[in-house]
Amino acid sequence: MDALLKEIEKLSQPSLQKENNDVCDLCFMQMKKISNYQLLCEECGQLKDWFEPEYNEKFTVYSRLKIVGANSSYHQRDLDKANSSDYSSLQFHHILEELKSLNVKYMDAGQKPFPIQVLKETAHSYNQVQQHRVIRSITKLQILASILRSICLKLNIACTVADAARFTQLNTKGISRGMDLLRSLFVDNKITLNVDLNPIDSFINSTYSALQIKQIHQELQEENVYNLKEIVKSFILYADEKNIGVDLNRRTVVIATMYNVLRRAYYPIEIDTVVYQCKIRKNTITRALKMYEDYYSHFKSLYEQYHLNAAKKLI
């Protein structure tokens, strides 16, 4: 039996990979591998995500032997533990590979892939949850989606509930069951991941990036206006405090607020530009902008505080 396991382990050793053949989308030059997760075009400087499965000596084929037949699931967990000196590490790598596979499918569907750091932290947190709760297959994807979204918010990366559900290929956009489980474990101090983080910062960062306004930000500073992100955040927090617009989608409110602030800072940005670059419907952002018209008297003092155009209506 030991000899058979050794032969199986030899077969599981990774073969030498072929040289990377990816080419740059912009200049069609050969891209250079700079890490396990990124390629670099030395001609134009473009970075591209790239996924290479990590090999772990403990994560071998014999560690994944499965029992078949009657009552197989009852004994499978014991077999896994018996064949692995580090069961927790085995589970981590198994979940990480599953997340990487989902990330590739997510990218193939036209979505922006999540950074490898998000995937690793999601796998680690899922491992923590497994130590305290038996996870049935019916809720596994909901829990992974809930963890993924919470990790993104912690790292200030935009991720809506719909994004997380789409990533894990759930049939429904709801992940409330997974969120409730994580929340109960957090309250009991069994996990350190807080699922109730405010998503505002992550949406501000993603909108800031989508509008490509790094240079705009510098110009606003030259005009002695406060940091753009902080201004947008202060408007949203003030609206929440006054219970204004709380029934609107958070991402929509952030996009509308940033557009409103930029316009009032005399920057010539058109709503059609925001619609295109942020991938949002025009009537959706228009409804959110109406919040600032209907409650103008509440926001006037903030306009003046940040030296913005305080007129009730902008031309």
UniProtKB/Swiss-Prot annotation:
Give the protein's function.
Answer: Putative initation factor.
Q: Which family does it belong to?
A: Belongs to the asfivirus C315R family.
> What's this protein's name?
Initiation factor TFIIB homolog
The record lists the organism as: African swine fever virus (strain Badajoz 1971 Vero-adapted) (Ba71V)
